[in-house]
Amino acid sequence: MSEFSQTVPELVAWARKNDFSISLPVDRLSFLLAVATLNGERLDGEMSEGELVDAFRHVSDAFEQTSETIGVRANNAINDMVRQRLLNRFTSEQAEGNAIYRLTPLGIGITDYYIRQREFSTLRLSMQLSIVAGELKRAADAAEEGGDEFHWHRNVYAPLKYSVAEIFDSIDLTQRLMDEQQQQVKDDIAQLLNKDWRAAISSCELLLSETSGTLRELQDTLEAAGDKLQANLLRIQDATMTHDDLHFVDRLVFDLQSKLDRIISWGQQSIDLWIGYDRHVHKFIRTAIDMDKNRVFAQRLRQSVQTYFDEPWALSYANADRLLDMRDEEMALRDEEVTGELPPDLEYEEFNEIREQLAAIIEEQLAVYKTRQVPLDLGLVVREYLSQYPRARHFDVARIVIDQAVRLGVAQADFTGLPAKWQPINDYGAKVQAHVIDKY
């Protein structure tokens, strides 16, 4: 977990005293990324000054800068990064002039943000969660065993603080990077739609589906492991309740629980927000197609007519069958009044009237249970009623019986929090889950 032992004034005074500052224009940042990439290919993690100059030359060529002053500008860039604590320089009397350079933690952190952390991997996340699960289980076992203060520090607090918490922070960082990627995808989609939305529809669909899939993979992986992680954290919390001197472990467990809840909650919220954006884009595309199709065609036709003698063309057209939009929100249901007289056998009786009659009959029959204070087993009662009606009416009759039954009273077993058993109510696979009503 990210904790600060110093106060805000102390941190401000410390930064001012050490003259901390970072200034990385795009060319300097590119140079730092190039250094990190080349450094990752070396086993010893060290680079000479000549190798840094070669990396700077590649960046300079990419930015189309002059090559006449490459040596001076490379030296200035290297010195500036050493001053900003992005590179460490090591020199020796035996090899004067041949300094060795290594990336500092700050340099690694910046380059890691731009290079490695932007690559989402479900396998990487699964491995992280697997490591966390193992560490939490061992810590929970050690907490239940108990021991002296050294035991709690070494076997419980240390794994939680320096392994579990850091991996949680890494997962949280992955989520925040996914937030940035979502914003970048939104910007890309906006640019595509502003240029030529007809040609951009397929590209927009690809970007939307890829981002949705990545978010869903991330959330599914988190939810699959979330319950087990929370269970082990609760085991540790239960073990510390009888020890007043373990408040530091209890506070850390609470922080980890909050962090895990926040990670899983934001993952689901991020998916919901993206679904809303996905619908917004599709609605925009549909609206654009409805509003713009004739205007675009007319504009292109006028341009083609004006340039016909320079660029002759032939017009082909097809009259395709109309596509009907069958979405529920746009369907208009017809409910026209029927006039005329019909024979008595064909008289129409609305379902509401039948339902009211059935409800009255069932209510009267079920009232006997309340009068006699007899427990009402909803599964048996519904099954008995359904046996009197054809299969096509089973759903409606079952709903009426249940509505009337729950008005009579409640089941005391509902307050225990235990789920009721499923009971079959007909011979076609229908089941009901309800406790016996015994309090009227």
Swiss-Prot record:
Subunit structure: Interacts, and probably forms a ternary complex, with MukE and MukB via its C-terminal region. The complex formation is stimulated by calcium or magnesium. It is required for an interaction between MukE and MukB.
Coiled-coil spans in chain: none
InterPro entries: Chromosome_partition_MukF, MukF_C, MukF_C_sf, MukF_M, MukF_M_sp, MukF_WHTH, WH-like_DNA-bd_sf, WH_DNA-bd_sf
GO MF entries: calcium ion binding
Superkingdom of origin organism: Bacteria
Function: Involved in chromosome condensation, segregation and cell cycle progression. May participate in facilitating chromosome segregation by condensation DNA from both sides of a centrally located replisome during cell division. Not required for mini-F plasmid partitioning. Probably acts via its interaction with MukB and MukE. Overexpression results in anucleate cells. It has a calcium binding activity.
Region annotation Leucine-zipper: where it falls in the sequence: 208-236
Keyword list, A-Z: Calcium, Cell cycle, Cell division, Chromosome partition, Cytoplasm, DNA condensation
SUPFAM superfamilies associated with the record: MukF C-terminal domain-like, Winged helix' DNA-binding domain
GO process terms (BP): cell division; chromosome condensation; chromosome segregation; DNA replication
Pfam families membership: KicB (PF03882), MukF_C (PF17193), MukF_M (PF17192)
UniProt similarity note: Belongs to the MukF family.
Protein name: Chromosome partition protein MukF
GO CC term (a single one): cytoplasm
Localization: Cytoplasm, Nucleoid
